[in-house]
Swiss-Prot record:
Pfam families, alphabetized: GET2 (PF08690)
Protein topology in the membrane: Multi-pass membrane protein
GO molecular function: protein transmembrane transporter activity; protein-membrane adaptor activity
Topological domain ranges for the Cytoplasmic compartment: 2-148, 217-263
Keywords attached to this entry: Acetylation, Endoplasmic reticulum, ER-Golgi transport, Glycoprotein, Golgi apparatus, Membrane, Phosphoprotein, Transmembrane, Transmembrane helix, Transport
Name of the protein in its database record: Golgi to ER traffic protein 2
Function noted in UniProt: Required for the post-translational delivery of tail-anchored (TA) proteins to the endoplasmic reticulum. Together with GET1, acts as a membrane receptor for soluble GET3, which recognizes and selectively binds the transmembrane domain of TA proteins in the cytosol. The GET complex cooperates with the HDEL receptor ERD2 to mediate the ATP-dependent retrieval of resident ER proteins that contain a C-terminal H-D-E-L retention signal from the Golgi to the ER. Involved in DNA replication and DNA damage response and also in cell wall function.
Glycosylation sites: N173, N196
Subunit structure and binding partners: Component of the Golgi to ER traffic (GET) complex, which is composed of GET1, GET2 and GET3. Within the complex, GET1 and GET2 form a heterotetramer which is stabilized by phosphatidylinositol binding and which binds to the GET3 homodimer.
InterPro entries: GET2, Get2/sif1
Species this chain originates from: Saccharomyces cerevisiae (strain ATCC 204508 / S288c)
């Protein structure tokens, strides 16, 4: 019989020692070493207890709580779906209750145009807050007052001043004028002189346009509607452009001023055209 190697000897010794400990020898050996043979303390060796298999539950792959990042992405999508559903329900004629937290599309566009309000309640972009929509009946009434003012202005200027004055300078010796005593007075003589026509016509136009402008302001005050800000389509179109897109400061205000000057200038051009036509007719008739 061959001799055992050192490794085999150590293995057999370890197996015998393990078998001895498993039969209860570990506790008695521990008591001898520590001197607690007659002690009431628990001196049972852990080696004497049967080894219980410890099972650990597998770690869950996914956490029970939802991901915060995922919730932040889902919330706007849900709001957008609610808004689209509400708009679709309105388009098909069905009354769909809309969540109070869902923003209105028109209000969102309006807030983008005017800017978010600051602490003082004014828009951050420097634009005025959007006014309430004007009733169509009020617009019709304003147009009626404006057209009536223009009609009366043209009638008074043409019939009661321009037409008689043009007839006077083209026919100063007509048999119509001696019938009126005021035509023979000294202050009436400059009116009969054709060389004073340009100065007299310019003075009359300045006075008539000034009076018309004041009456126009009275119409706006009476109807509570501004003639250009609330009725002109070009001004409304420019007001939709956000501040800073076009490199012109106060573009809406400058456009309104330009349109006001054009309105007054168009009246002057109309009167000049009327004068030229009447002078041509009176000259060749």
């Amino acid at each position: 019989m061959s001799e055992l190697t050192e490794a085999e000897k150590r293995r057999l010794l370890r197996e015998r020692r393990q078998k001895k400990f498993s039969n209860g020898g570990a506790s008695s050996r521990l008591n001898k070493i520590t001197g607690q043979a007659s002690s009431h303390l628990n001196a049972e060796s852990p080696l004497d207890a049967p080894s219980a298999a410890k099972t650990t539950p597998p770690a869950s792959v996914h956490s029970a709580t939802p991901d915060i990042k995922e919730d932040s992405n889902v919330a706007p999508q849900l709001d957008l779906l609610k808004q689209l559903a509400a708009m679709q329900g309105q388009g098909t004629g069905k009354s769909t209750p809309q969540d109070s937290s869902t923003p209105d599309l028109l209000s969102l566009l309006s807030s983008m145009n005017t800017g978010m309000p600051s602490a003082e309640g004014t828009p951050s972009f420097g634009q005025a807050a959007p006014a309430a929509p004007i009733n169509q009946a009020a617009l019709d009434y304003h147009d009626y007052l404006l057209n009536r003012l223009k009609a009366w202005t043209i009638l008074v200027k043409w019939v009661f001043f321009l037409l008689p004055y043009l007839y006077l300078i083209t026919r100063p010796n007509s048999s119509v004028w001696p019938a009126y005593a005021f035509t023979q007075s000294a202050w009436f003589a400059p009116l009969r002189n054709p060389s004073n026509f340009t100065r007299i016509f310019a003075t009359f136009e300045f006075l008539s346009i000034s009076i018309y402008y004041q009456l126009l302001k009275n119409v706006e005050h009476k109807s509570k509607i501004k003639n250009l800000q609330d009725t002109n389509k070009l001004v409304k179109l420019v007001s939709l452009v956000p501040e800073g897109v076009i490199p012109v400061a106060n573009l809406k205000g400058k456009l309104i001023t330009l349109l006001q000057y054009w309105d007054l200038l168009s009246m002057l051009i109309t009167d000049i055209s009327f004068v030229l036509i009447v002078l041509g007719l009176l000259t060749y008739l």
